[in-house]
């Protein structure tokens, strides 16, 4: 919030210099998962935990599942040694009892909520809002344990980013990930397009040499885009597309 009182009695221009301080606690940010409408976090009727894009960058998270490890009250766990799928556990309940949303819409099915968390690139996420407990049932019958609302990035400026990340599991198995993100805006800011993608190749890892991998091989490709058109000041048409292959 910026509050400044200024009185000008002449026609001469007046120059003002001021500094903005970052809100460390994040209480003034707007969330939509509390009541399905945008409101300040400090006035929301339920507790909403937010993980921003800065948190994904600080933790070097490649996918959504890696970033959720740092969210209070959530736990990512691997439940299958054969396929290596991971699910989020909230309030001690399995992933099937949590509702996963993209821009407040229940696009994810119960099956995709298990396998899809590893395939959403972190560079496409603006923030993740988490509501724990029965109050999140506002979004559907699956939201018994809680709701995870994924807010993707809105096109705000023209840019293109490409990043590569390599990790060695146990000094043996390589994990290579390449991600890209591009935004194109019109001159009047009424039309915008944001594209994102990720390619990941993870080699299998066998710790004790018994022929069974503790960490399975993964090769997935993810691509999608977000677009919008504003025909008026209070109207907006949006079109989103996501494709995932593993």
Describe each model-derived feature in a short phrase.
Residues 9-57, 95:
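Short, acidic, small-residue-rich periplasmic hinge/interaction motif at the N-terminus
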């Amino acid at each position: 919030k910026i509050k400044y009182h200024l009185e000008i009695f002449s026609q001469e221009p007046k120059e003002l210099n001021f500094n903005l301080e970052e809100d460390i606690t994040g209480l003034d940010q707007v969330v939509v998962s509390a009541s399905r409408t945008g409101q300040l976090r400090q006035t929301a009727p339920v507790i909403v935990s937010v993980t921003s894009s800065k948190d994904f960058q600080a933790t070097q998270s490649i996918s959504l599942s890696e970033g959720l490890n740092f969210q209070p009250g959530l736990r990512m766990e691997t439940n299958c040694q054969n396929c290596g799928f991971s699910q989020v556990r909230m309030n001690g309940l399995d992933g099937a009892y949590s509702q996963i949303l993209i821009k407040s819409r229940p696009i994810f099915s119960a099956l995709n909520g298990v396998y899809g968390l590893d395939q959403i690139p972190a560079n496409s996420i603006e923030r993740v809002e988490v509501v724990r407990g029965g109050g999140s049932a506002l979004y559907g019958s699956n939201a018994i344990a809680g709701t995870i609302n994924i807010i993707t990035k809105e096109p705000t400026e023209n840019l293109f980013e490409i990043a590569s990340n390599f990790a060695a599991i146990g000094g043996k198995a390589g994990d290579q990930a390449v991600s890209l993100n591009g935004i194109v805006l019109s001159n009047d800011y009424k039309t915008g397009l944001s594209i994102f993608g990720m390619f990941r190749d993870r080699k299998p890892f066998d710790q004790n040499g018994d022929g069974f991998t503790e960490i399975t091989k993964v090769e997935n490709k993810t691509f999608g885009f977000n677009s919008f058109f504003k025909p008026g000041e209070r109207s907006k048409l949006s079109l989103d597309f996501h494709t995932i292959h593993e």
